[in-house]
Amino acid sequence: MFQISSFGKKIGKVTGIGELMNDIGDAMQKPGEVILMGGGNPAKIQEMQEVFHSLLNEVSDLNRFSKIISSYDSPQGNEDFLQDVAKYFQRTFGWNITRNNVAITNGSQNAFFYLLNMFSGKFPDGSKKKILFPMVPEYIGYADQTLEEDTLRSYLPKIEYTGKHSFKYRVDFDALKIDESIGAICVTRPTNPTGN
């Protein structure tokens, strides 16, 4: 009888982020104007569209296109791109990094899959570690990223009322516990478009 592995079952199940992306995809296929408030870039900025279009035209040069399409880069990524990213961080932030400090992934979901699984779960010494999210609510896409069960830990926030119909979440530092069971702390605030 045909079976799939536990991993296959995990990646094949319905997830919160999968449902969110399906909803967005369905909405984008319907006629009429759609205002995107999350699940991607909420704004199309004309000046950036023009920059991207110009860069795509540069790539369409036959020699560059042929190299990009038919030649493998190193497993770490395109050497010129790695160097450029490192130089950007050196110049912009004064960070002393090299190409060896740059990781290229297929996007943020893929990057967080690697990061969360590198720092959580069972370790060679027999310990088990978790990823700490200092407060929830948090980005729904993290919920199904880890391969092992029971690897995420979070705390309820303090709620600061800032007006009649508005509030902010704040980390409850009094409740926060960080000990040897925490492999990494993940701090993000993906609340498009406000950044709250």
Model-identified regions with their sequence ranges:
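N-terminal "arm"/small-domain region of PLP-dependent enzymes with the aminotransferase-like
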Residues: 1-76, 87, 91, 174, ...
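Conserved core of the PLP fold type I
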Residues: 67-196
